[in-house]
Amino acid sequence: MAKNAASNKTARVAQVLLIALATGGALAGCAAPGAYRPELYAATAHDPYTLSAGDRLRVIVFGQDSLSNTYSVDGAGRIAMPLIGSVPVQGRTVTDVEREIAGRLREGYVREPRVSVEVEAFRPFFVLGEVTNAGQYPFVDAMTVRTAIAIAGGFGPRGYQGAVDLTRVIDGVPVTGRVPLDAPVRPGDTITVRERIF
């Protein structure tokens, strides 16, 4: 009987351990970013740039000085222009926005409008975690993770100097993965430097 009770107790302990391991593994999987998937980030590295809140656009309507100006993309992903009002730009390319503005101006405001849109200032990128000066910084073209960390003052004394976690919005969904230091950075990316394990 004592042998049977010990056997039951051992079985219960084993069940509890298995449940704890399974739960811990599941929670760790939720909290930790995915492994480095170069194809995911490489696929978006050379995609046409899409606009979002924080970008500043230079809009030129040729022959219409009152419409040509610099416009900031607001939190709703729109710019506000004279005559045509609010123009949605979130997730669109500058070419898409040129067509949209020209189409609206053609509706009774300007005959055969010629419109040029360019990004005057990109939205910032963010560096968090174990760096000297965490925060947001203005984007510079052809930037890598290494460059971004240097702009943030370099690694902190406890910063892991291998791969970092990079969060990028892809098709409207934030995706986080581990990337090497030579990975390209895009406007709006968030780089998180983890603490190294001693």
In which residue ranges do the predicted regions lie?
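Sec-dependent N-terminal signal peptides
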Residues: 8-26
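Ser/Thr/Pro/Gly-biased, low-complexity, turn-/loop-rich segments
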Residues: 2-6, 17-18, 29-198
